Amino acid sequence: NQDCLSDWSFYEQYCYKVF
């Protein structure tokens, strides 16, 4: 499931910030 903030992306099992 994708539980990231609007400006974050989901990769495998964690979120990362997209710049």
Curated annotation (Swiss-Prot):
Task: Spell out the GO cellular component terms annotated for this protein, sorted alphabetically and separated by semicolons.
Answer: extracellular region
Q: Which residues form the C-type lectin domain?
A: 1-19
Q: Name the source's superkingdom.
A: Eukaryota
Instruction: Quote the tissue specificity entry.
Output: Expressed by the venom gland.
Key word Disulfide bond present:
yes
Any GO molecular function: carbohydrate binding
List the subcellular locations.
Answer: Secreted
Q: Which family does it belong to?
A: Belongs to the true venom lectin family.
Q: What is this protein called?
A: C-type lectin domain-containing protein 1
Lineage at the top is: Eukaryota, Metazoa, Chordata, Craniata, Vertebrata
